[in-house]
Amino acid sequence: MKLRVPLLLLSLAGVCGAWMAIQTGYARSGAATSVSNHVGARASSSGLPRPSPAETGAHWIWQNPLPQGNTLYGVSFTDANTGTATGDNGTIIRTTDGGNSWAIQSSGTANTLYGVSFTDVNHGTAVGAFGAIVRTTDGGNTWSSQTSGTTNGLLAVSFTDANTGTAVGENGAIVRTTNGGNTWVSQTSGTPNNLTAVSFTDANNGTAVSWDGIILRTTDGGANWVSQTSGTDNILYGVWFTDANNGTAVGFGGTIVRTTNGGANWVSQASGTKSSLYGVSFSDPNNGTAVGGDGIIVRTTNGGTTWITQTSGTTSTFIGVSFTDANAGTAVGASGIILRTTDGGTNWVSKSTAVTTESLEDVSFTDANTGTAVGDDGTILRTTNGGSTWVNQTSGTINTLLGVSFIDANNGTAVGVLGTILRTTDGGNSWVPQVSGTVDDLWGVSFTDANNGTAVGFDFNTVTGLILRTTDGGSSWISQSNGAFSPLVGVSFTDANIGTVVGGAGIILRTTDGGNNWVPQISGTESDLLRVSFTDANNGTAVGQSGTILRTTDGGSHWVLQQSGTTELLAGVSFTDADHGIAVGALGTIVRTTDGGSTWVNETSGTSYDLSRVSLSTAVGYGGAILRRELVLRPTPTPRPVPTPRPRPTPPR
């Protein structure tokens, strides 16, 4: 059982992180002209592209969800077409066509950005974890870091013009600028609680909300913040004022409170939902929309006298919302979801796409184009164009699938919990269940041809290793004696006879006779090993807990610890030849080597979601994340024209 916990953390860390963010008040703000709301393998001969003289590097792009899959917390539109959203891992995306298309921008930070506020199409500020503040004056083409003067997370921001803005956050933090962020000055809030949202309508009048129904009000630009009586003890996550008098705050359990006199009195309103509301946006004193958990969207056209539930078409959590007029609005939230309305919410249309949001546990590519990913609830995805499109396949099971191995475009096997084994011979058009002979979870599988394959797992009660072997394409599976008293989770065969299995407490087993005999090898570590990749009988790499990477060049007679450069859990590894390999893991970690692991270089994944496996240049993980490594090429310079020399005149004799 030692290994099962870190493995499951791969699936749970992302959702727990989002949940903790929501529960601790990572959900925020508003302003009259802007809003920010926030809640907290099998090796292939094709190989990775080798660097060429024109190559300047590579980056990882999102293939699922699109335009990206990081949770979005803040959104700010300045007109019906132009808007910016921010989220996990420093995510900033921008649209200039009403959300039909979104461009990913470089924020220059990996800190989660919880709040964003634009006052016009060019000037905007985003705030986030550890006091991060980034600023743009050119619509996001460039973002520059600013010094907030605090290490507290900033959860919301509200600007009223290009120069004047206020950010609030953890532990009652408030910082203020009057010069576009060149300097930020700390203000005294009078509370130690997290301030979750803020809304200013002009340079002087602003309101911030917090836990326990706390509402703070200033009429002098924050020189003094005065506590108001909200009438609720619930956490307030969002607030929006349309002028100095008219404002609405929303929060836990569907809480809505309203003021028409600048907060002198707050009156409770019936939202019609028990789902928590994380964001709110009004375009005028009458027309407003609040969003929250379980896909809830509620709308008022009479200043909150009545709130009507609208159909979002999803149960995903919405965290931020921005309306620029009574009709045009955008809601954002978990796993990068984006919804758009142009009719006041009568119809909400998705502007983001996801072939799945189920976590993906393994992936197998047989060439640069053809690959299959498997995951939770029996999810199977297939691509034949390098991931440009992924298609759901029918697995016939709701059991989580933990491993997959294809030997060519047609023949593949997937394994999973409760002894699940599925087989396809037509590229996944049909998957046929096979009899494994066990109800124990199977974590990995490796086939070398259509007949010979090995699956590994462990008995959950005795925590002893399990190895199953087939020599007839899975028509029959036979348990092999292995002597392992640790879970077995990773397997790699290079031919029908030679294979290696890894697992808990640093265990490594090796066979040269198709598994008739499994021989323990000395790993030199007690760290759990989660995956192993061999490219031939001699060269192999295993990865695991605490950034562990082990390398052998002699078939495992000797394993050498390599410097991965990370202490994060590494859950997947894929080598395409003896030199080129990629390892992935927790919190979006990706490291790559081009020299057999003598050096490992960190690459920016663009996400903090856990990545479970990698095959060739495609990584998969939490929330259906699919990332693809693509080369960035230098533009080929245009040759200069060579001038035709003019004939020299013949000198006279």
Predicted regions and their residues:
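Short, low-complexity, Pro/Ser/Thr/Gly-rich segments in the mature regions of secreted, periplasmic
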Residues: 643-652
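Bacterial N-terminal signal peptides
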Residues: 9-18
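Positively charged n-region of N-terminal signal peptides that target proteins for export
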Residues: 1-5
